[in-house]
Design a protein with these regions (language model features):
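Structured aminoacyl-transfer and RNA-binding surfaces used for tRNA recognition/handling
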Residues: 1-211
Length: 211
């Protein structure tokens, strides 16, 4: 078994080897932002750069962000929820997109951590009246599983979900888009182990505009 420190070190090193620069964890209590009590996701302190600001460390970043999620408090004590945790994240600022993002994530889990590819599942956005199905991610997953000798089918290894499960956006609007989550089968239950968010839209009011 790996400790959380060993997993963090492997993650940072893996993405540094793929031309990412490590950035520090932002303060747990947000500076100049009253919208949340604590930073609750690795993406939170990077939103200005996802909106177009230039990051001093470049366009490929990796970090381990300290987080607290008050909405998870009732779940603390089971095998999947913690009071506080570190969220590992790799970030592409107008650099690579879906194909390389999903490839890197899967490669880290399978080749660096030794996860069994046969126990890995993916979810993708199924589309709705305001945003189309993420067919690109579906095709990427089918081809990646095929490289490992798996004939992945939608509805089996690749599951389609709605906005409640496979969409990221801020309540205040701004950049948003579909995501593709990765799950690992543990004792017959699928446990989320990773997520790639794709900022393809700008939400203005109730309208989603392609970026």
């Amino acid at each position: 078994h790996l400790s959380y420190k060993e997993i963090r070190e492997k993650y940072i090193k893996f993405f540094e080897q793929n031309n990412h620069k490590e950035i520090n964890s932002a303060p747990l209590v947000p500076e100049n932002d009253p919208s949340v009590l604590f930073v609750n996701a690795g993406m939170f302190p990077l939103v200005p750069f996802l909106q177009g600001e230039t990051h001093p460390n470049g366009t490929r970043l990796v970090n381990s962000q300290r987080c607290v999620r008050t909405i998870d408090i009732d779940g603390v004590g089971d095998a999947y929820h913690c009071t506080t945790f570190e969220m590992l994240g790799n970030w592409s600022l107008n650099d690579y997109f879906k194909k390389e993002a999903i490839e890197l994530t899967l490669k880290f889990f399978v080749e660096e951590l030794g996860f069994d590819i046969n126990r890995i599942y993916a979810t993708v956005f199924k589309g709705d009246d305001t945003s189309p199905k993420d067919t690109e991610s579906i095709d990427i997953w089918i081809n990646l599983f095929k490289e490992y000798g798996i004939d992945a089918k939608v509805g089996e290894k690749i599951l389609e979900k709605g906005k409640d499960d496979n969409w990221w956006e801020l309540a205040t609007g701004g950049p948003c888009g579909p995501d593709s989550e990765i799950f690992y089968e543990v004792d017959g239950q699928l446990v989320e182990i990773g997520n790639n968010v794709f900022m393809e839209y700008l939400k203005v009011g109730n309208e989603y505009r392609p970026l």
